Every structure is written in structure tokens, then in C-alpha cells.
Amino acid sequence: MKKNIILTYVYLIIAISFAIISCNKNSNTEEIPQKENPKKENPKKEEPKKGDSSLLAYSKPFYLFTETKAYEMTKQEKDPYLKKLYYQIAATPTAEWFEGVEAFDDTTLKRLIEGAKAQQKTPIITLYGIPYRDCGSYSTGGHKTAASYKVWINRTSAIIGKTPIIVIVEPDAHNFCLKKGWKYNDAKYKERAELLSYVGKTFADNNPNALLYLHIGGTELKQEEAAQAVIDGGIRYMRGFVTNVADHRGTPRAEKWSEEFVQTLQKKGLGTKYYVIDTSRNGIDSPKQTNKAYYYSCNNFNAALGVRPTTKTSAPHADAYLWIKHPGLSDGTCANGDPEAGSWYPAVAKSLVQKAIEKGIIEEWKVPNNF
């Protein structure tokens, strides 16, 4: 009898031991994946600086569109030294400009969007087709009528869809014209303000992942007049504004003005707006003019490339530094012998890169063997 009782206790102890071991195994099996594969948060999404942690356009690298004059000229260049210089421009993601007057603009935009999607990168474009563009300066052009412009904006919005994208809205649409004497109650000004607002509202309604930045010039406008211009131009529908497009003002100065402008807009009830700065040619702050053009940023051989596109900025409301103006393209016939605006200008391209490398502004990238 005693023997049976002892055996029963032994079996009971063994059974309990197996049960405990089994429970521990199950418990460990459930915890192991968390220990071996801890969930890693995306550091970009933790940055409070950007204001909105769900900005998809800034969660990916910028897309390099290769259908550019810089890329084409670099591929064709036979001189190894010049090829190396031009490559510094050609290999840097830069905003692609569209005016929407020619049919090929739509097909080019579609290729750009598809290319960016395939590489899971963010495209950057510039809308540059507003009627009476550039207020009669070197880059005059654009759509002939407001109706035509709106049709193009509708098409562009439809092509972009839900693609995460950065959109620069109409460089020099306000600053050039206001400096040339446009008044806030002029018919042309009112039409322009209405068209810019149309751009903002169209994208706000149909393109949830598009970040729009309305151009307000360099720092040549006073804060109050600049504020009235962007408010009239529908900045309430956009992420914010862009400054320094094609200009040579240094980044610290551009940021100082822009941070003050953010406060100016807040005081006018617009909430917090953000901005981007064109650093494509601002490596040297306001270089001395080298020709007789009426503005110093026109084919200036004293200028240098600025820092390459990045979201690592120095100011709380600066979303990014971008290359918006294409370095190496002519600003226009600023001096004798200068090519037309938008043409490849080898001498300017060479000078911009040389000065940037000399001053350590950009890292010199090696040209691939098969380029």
C-alpha cells in the first residue's frame, strides 16, 4: 500500500514537472520574436520639426530624373575633367519644370511619376506656366489665357493622383511683378492671385500626398507685402512657401527671413506654414555681379553651387533645402554672348562646380565607369 502511494506521488511530481516545462516553453516561444526582431521606429517620423509626422514625400529619397540637359550634356562630354564637373550637377536630384503649353509636358510628367514610383523615391516638380510669366523678363511665356492654365492644372493634378510629390508653385509669380509696379488692385494681379489659389485648391482637393510651396521670391519684398501676396495667392491651401528660387542669397539669410515670415503669416491667422529653400546656386551669399544684367543672379560667374538637396535643415520650419533652378542652364541673354534662357551654358556650369568644390560646399562624386 505504502509502495503504491509513493509511486502515485512520484508520477504526480513527474506530471507536474512536465506541465511546468511545457508552459515555460510556450511562454518563451511567444516572447522570442519580440526579442530577436524588436520593432524599429522610423527616426524620420519621430522628428517633431516637420510638424506632420505623416509627410510621405519626405519619407523617401529624392528622385533623380535623367531626362535633363545636364544629364545629356554630361553623357556626351568627352573631356574627363569637364565630365567630372558636369556630373556633380547631372547626378543631383533637381526639380523638373513644366509649363504645360506643349503636349509633351504631360507625357514627360507621366514618365517622371512612373520612374519615381518604380524607384520608390519622391519626385520634385515646378509649375511654371502662369499667363504673363516672368512679367516680361528673360523667361517670358506661359499660357495665353486663364482658362487654358486651369485646364492644364486639372490635367497635372490628375496625372499626379496620390503620388507623394513636392510641387514648387510658379517662381516669380509675385515678386517680379510687384517690383515692376503691379498693384494689388490691378486686374492682372487679381487674375494671378485667383489662378494661384486655383492651383492650391485643386491639389488640396485631389492630391493628398502633394506638398505645395508657393514662391515668394528671395528676400526682396517686405514682410507685409509678401504676406498679402501669398494670402491672396491661396497659401492657405498649401504646405507653405519657397524662397530663393534661382537666386544666390545664402541659406542663413534666407532662413532668417523665412522664419520671420512664418511668424508674420501666423499673426494673420494662417496657422503654421513651412518652407523650402533653393540652394542650387547659393553657395556664396550674394556674389558680386559679373555682367550688366539688372539683377545679380543672371549668369553670375562668381556664384557657386549650394548644398545638395536634404531634409537636414537648420531652422524649425524649413522642410528641406532643394535644387529647384537647374544649375548650368542660362538665365537669359544677360550679357553679350549669353545663350537664351534655359539653354545649357557650359562655362557657367563649370564655374559653379569649381567654386563649390574649392570651398568645400559639396562632396565631389566619382563618375561611374559606364557613364
Predicted feature descriptions by range:
Residues 1-10:
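Bacterial N-terminal signal peptides that target proteins for export
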Residues 58-155, 159, 325-352, 356-366:
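N-terminal carbohydrate-binding/catalytic regions of secreted carbohydrate-active enzymes
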Residues 103, 111-212, 228, 235-237:
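Substrate-binding cleft of extracellular glycoside hydrolase catalytic domains
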Residues 20-53:
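Bacterial Sec-dependent N-terminal signal peptides
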Residues 65-90, 219-349:
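Surface-exposed substrate-engagement region within the catalytic domains
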Residues 60-64, 95-96, 123-125, 165-169, ...:
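Hydrophobic faces of well-ordered beta-strands that scaffold small-molecule active sites
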